[in-house]
Design a protein with these regions (language model features):
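Hydrophobic small-molecule pocket/channel-lining residues, especially in calycin-type beta-barrels
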Residues: 1-155
Length: 155
């Protein structure tokens, strides 16, 4: 895509501080960087743990970090896709939409549906969302909350 400014993925470009929580309990911190690759054809996400003394031991033991993802945009239907991989050897293909208000990621897989619904706030410098799982795609259970805060605009 020659005009990156028209691509919704442009909203993610930069560095973000991440915090994960589950049932009100702090799990851990990470840092994610979203960058254009292949002359603006795709966005790559690289996320790494940020070690801290308050990381939940269970989270640290099963952390997906580092995470790598490639995001792309279908300009004919206005939808995006994410190819995801992590340190646990997990590989997923997610469908995705990114609007001015929300970032939604989902995967329909028999017995293990997943979705993330995040909303933009603070002039799009914060994304507050939740990962959920479902066995049947109907009844959803919270997995963990995830907040992205733009780090490259912090003062």
């Amino acid at each position: 895509m020659s005009d990156r400014t028209a691509n919704p993925l442009n909203r993610l470009i930069g560095t973000w501080e991440l915090q994960a929580r589950s049932q009100g309990r702090f799990l851990g911190r990470a840092r994610a960087t979203f960058e254009w690759i292949e002359d603006g054809a795709f966005v790559v996400e690289n996320a790494e743990d940020v070690p801290s003394g308050d990381t939940d031991p269970g989270w640290a033991e099963h952390s997906p970090m580092p995470v790598r993802a490639i995001l792309g945009f279908d300009d004919t239907i206005g939808r995006q896709a994410m190819l995801y991989s992590d340190a646990r050897g997990v590989f997923r293909i997610y469908a995705m939409t990114l609007t001015d208000e929300a970032w939604t990621i989902w995967r329909d897989a028999p017995g293990f549906n997943q979705r993330f619904i995040g909303t933009f706030a603070d002039g799009a410098d914060t994304i507050a969302g939740r990962w959920e799982t479902s066995e049947d795609g109907q009844d959803w259970t919270p997995d963990f909350d995830l907040v992205y805060r733009r780090a490259d605009r912090m003062t």
